[in-house]
From Swiss-Prot:
The gene is hisC. It catalyses: L-histidinol phosphate + 2-oxoglutarate = 3-(imidazol-4-yl)-2-oxopropyl phosphate + L-glutamate. HAMAP family: HisC_aminotrans_2. The modification N6-(pyridoxal phosphate)lysine is found at K212. Homodimer. PROSITE patterns: AA_TRANSFER_CLASS_2. Pathway: Amino-acid biosynthesis; L-histidine biosynthesis; L-histidine from 5-phospho-alpha-D-ribose 1-diphosphate: step 7/9. Gene3D superfamilies: Aspartate Aminotransferase, domain 1 (3.90.1150.10), Type I PLP-dependent aspartate aminotransferase-like (Major domain) (3.40.640.10). Its cofactor is pyridoxal 5'-phosphate. It comes from the Bacteria. GO terms for molecular function: histidinol-phosphate transaminase activity; pyridoxal phosphate binding. This is Histidinol-phosphate aminotransferase. Its EC number is 2.6.1.9.
Amino acid sequence: MNIKKLVRKDIRELIPYQSARKIGGKGDIWLNANEFPEFNNIKLNNIILNRYPECQPEQLTSCYSSYIGINKSNILITRGIDEAIELLIKTFCNPQNEKIIFCPPTYDMYNISAKIIGIKSYEVPLLNFSWQLDINNIAKYISDAKLIYICNPNNPTGNLINYQDIITLLNITLGKTLVIVDEAYIEFSPIHSLTNLIDTYPNLVILRTLSKAFALAGLRCGFILTNVNIVKFLLKVINPYPIPIPTTSIAVQFLSKNNINEMRNRIFDLTLNRFWLVNKLKSMNNCVEHVFNSFANYILVRFYNSRKVFDILSKKGIIVRDQSNKLHLSRCLRISIGTSKECLEVVRVIQKINSLCVY
């Protein structure tokens, strides 16, 4: 039996998302998935697993509402941001004639999720090197696009999207298109969050996660923050039991006041590591062409020979993410910010490459 003949043509041709775990590699220093470099101590006591969980656990919704400062009715819990991306497309896009807009170089799952569901995409690249929205070009495609995905801070470039451009986009799409702002990394630059605009713009949807700053990537817990009417429709489409009971228990622990303070302290330390790493790399002119400014827990670096740098780092057990195949990112590697010790080892290896001109 030829199973391939039964598979949708577009799925047969689909190039799937290459997660850090799929790509793999052998090493001791993992700086390729923007995970927090150190793990948390987690307690699981008296967990009852013979009953199905609530669709939207009340305790977790309340805790996140207190943390984020918005009403509980504006929150939908999902299994990470990836489920949220897909859920919005399923709910709002008609495969026959509606599309999404995404702005590369950015997170690949916006486009891949649309393809899997059978929705076409408009690709409107960010302006080269500034990595800002091309508002004039986006405006040309709004009429038959239901969703626009924006990552802020943007992954993999690390920059913030201009606030006024987002406001302009919200205004020109009002009543026509939802503007979805992925704030997966916003805890590393919290004053730039758009949560205060949810009541002002009914077409604004914000995506959040516990994977990055909260160091809970393995938990798969995300949030959609938006107006009440959008939440009501999403609840029609989301799976009946999306949030496992252990996920709720752990997430609630880490949304306590003490753990939130600890998270902010960790971000402070990691930000110091980022500044230090950026300054060191900028001094290595023989092999480093450019270090892009970052407001997240990773940096994007353009090397004169990124393949050689990538291979040498890998041989030394340091796993980073090659971005050279992305639009406008030739010779670029993305390096997640690790511990002080890990950053020191990255610098040691690249300094050797720089001094010997081995690239």
